[in-house]
Regions:
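Hydrophobic transmembrane alpha-helices of multi-pass small-molecule transporters
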Residues: 1-75, 188-289, 425, 429-437
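Juxtamembrane and boundary regions of transmembrane helices in multi-pass small-molecule transporters
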Residues: 26, 155-158, 162-221, 379-380, ...
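Core transmembrane alpha-helical segments of multi-pass membrane transporters/permeases
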Residues: 32, 44, 55-88, 104, ...
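Juxtamembrane helix-boundary/capping and inter-helix hinge elements in multi-pass membrane proteins
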Residues: 48-51, 63-67, 86, 143-147, ...
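Membrane-interfacial loop-to-helix junctions in multi-pass transporters
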Residues: 64-70, 95-113, 139-149, 223-231, ...
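Hydrophobic alpha-helical transmembrane segments of multi-pass integral membrane proteins
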Residues: 71-80, 101-134, 314-354, 358-359, ...
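Alpha-helical transmembrane segments of multi-pass membrane proteins
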Residues: 104-117, 143-160, 322-335, 359-380, ...
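Re-entrant/interfacial helical elements at transmembrane boundaries that shape
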Residues: 126-138, 154, 165-179, 309-310, ...
């Protein structure tokens, strides 16, 4: 155990936040540079290992399987967003959406769609990768804030990630606490649904108050061509709902968008290739952040930082309620460092289970709490996969905003955390017969 191993995370936070406040614009502070500064501090502060060994640890963290899969999703999401836009699918989607959905409900509607898809498929990253390109299509034409649209998508994705029976976080939370998924679902619904309803209302109000300049008038008539050009979006959503791997989903969507773009004139063969290539390059900053964050976490973990954090929180627990609060903070802090809620639950879960047995805390409550803590932090950290995918897709569509700019529009995770605290402090969660076992 080594508390000093956590210093690089403090270096990252101080560097990024301080310069962002000084500049009054977080987008002016490259997050990649902040991570490089933090990694440099980790390499020079660590003791007991040769510098070459630390570099190897850094490389292993950057090359982690989960990080590589995340990067592949970033690349494909960038290609799909760029090709779909160039093919004319964006304008067609906007024209058809305005026929079926009032403009004032567009943001709230995307929150609902994202929630339902994530609940069905159990993956927030896959949901955001599938829905974000569609959401960005509505920003300019309807005069809506792209950050608000992205925030609604991320919020909905985290709702499903927390509740879905097939979500990695649900599986990890229930297995580490030894409880049934159904019991955990019931406990979580009591907290998640009220938070989601408040978020829906906020997005409805926020979407109704948008006063941007529309580039596609409300009276634009839909044509047969519009129905054809939106097929890539339809295909991506349907395949995502069917549970197909997100890599295959995005590949098929990109190919179909390119074929339709060539067939209906906006693109030719070489133009489609060039557009796809540019879309992938637009994700370069997102890819770099993912790689660097993976390497930094590996350095900190190997130096004993995560182990010390677990010990420090566990020794503060004195009873059932403090056990529940400790479970929330332990999972949340580990997630803050790992930038992966499933990994955070797997790391914190066994410790939480032992504390629960010792202080007779309800394991069903604990399973719900650690899942909520993971989803809360994962939905608001600007270097997490969900925020990175959303900002990357937005950048591919021509919209620039910082991760913090997006987080300020991601309301649901904050509401979910507040709901969880209320549940803990007021003991409003259903009492499980397994408590104290």
């Amino acid at each position: 155990m080594n508390a000093f191993a956590l210093i690089p995370f403090a270096v990252f936070a101080v560097f990024y936040v301080t310069l962002g406040v000084v500049a009054r614009d977080f987008y002016r502070v490259p997050m990649t540079v902040a991570f490089l500064v933090a990694i440099a501090s980790a390499l020079f502060l660590g003791k007991g290992k040769k510098f070459s060994e630390k570099i190897e640890i850094l490389a292993k963290g950057m090359g982690n399987q989960d990080i590589m899969l995340m990067c592949l999703i970033f690349i494909l999401a960038g290609a799909f967003a760029a090709v779909a836009k160039a093919s004319g699918a964006v304008d067609s989607a906007v024209i058809l959406a305005r026929v079926a959905i009032p403009d004032s409900f567009m943001v709230a509607g995307l929150f609902l769609v994202s929630s339902l898809i994530s609940l069905a498929v159990g993956t927030s990253c896959g949901t955001i990768a599938a829905v974000a390109p569609i959401a960005m299509a509505f920003a300019g034409p309807l005069g809506l804030s792209p950050a608000l649209l992205a925030g609604a998508i991320v919020s909905g994705a985290m709702f499903g990630d927390n509740l879905s029976m097939i979500s990695d976080t649900t599986i990890a939370a229930t297995r580490t606490q030894g409880v049934d998924m159904r019991d955990k679902f019931i406990a979580n619904v009591a907290l998640a649904v009220p938070a989601a309803m408040v978020a829906l209302f906020i997005y409805l109000v926020a979407g109704s108050s948008q006063t941007g300049v529309e580039t596609i008038p409300a009276g634009a008539a839909a044509s047969f061509k519009d129905f054809v050009l939106i097929l890539p979006y339809v295909l991506v959503l349907l395949l995502a709902l069917l549970g197909m791997n997100v890599v295959i989903v995005l590949l098929l969507g990109t190919v179909l968008a390119a074929l339709l773009g060539v067939a209906f004139g906006p693109l030719n063969f070489w133009g489609a290739l060039e557009t796809a290539g540019k879309g992938t390059l637009d994700m370069s900053e997102t890819l770099t952040i993912a790689l660097l964050s993976g390497g930094l976490f590996k350095l900190v973990k190997e130096s004993g930082g995560i182990e010390w954090l677990t010990y420090a929180i566990a020794r503060k627990v004195r009873g059932p309620k403090s056990c529940e609060l400790g479970a929330f903070f332990l999972t949340g802090l580990v997630n803050l460092f790992t930038a992966n809620n499933t990994v955070a639950i797997v790391i914190a879960g066994p410790v939480v289970r032992e504390l629960g047995k010792k202080f007779k805390a309800d394991p069903v409550k604990l399973a719900g709490i650690i899942d909520i803590a993971g989803c809360f932090i994962q939905g608001i950290i600007p270097y997490g996969a969900q925020i990175l995918i959303a900002t990357g897709v937005a950048r591919s569509a021509g919209y620039e905003f910082s991760g913090f700019g997006l987080v300020s529009c991601t309301y649901y995770p904050f509401l979910l955390a507040l709901s969880a605290f209320a549940g803990i402090l007021l003991s409003s969660l259903r009492k499980s017969p397994e408590a104290g076992k």
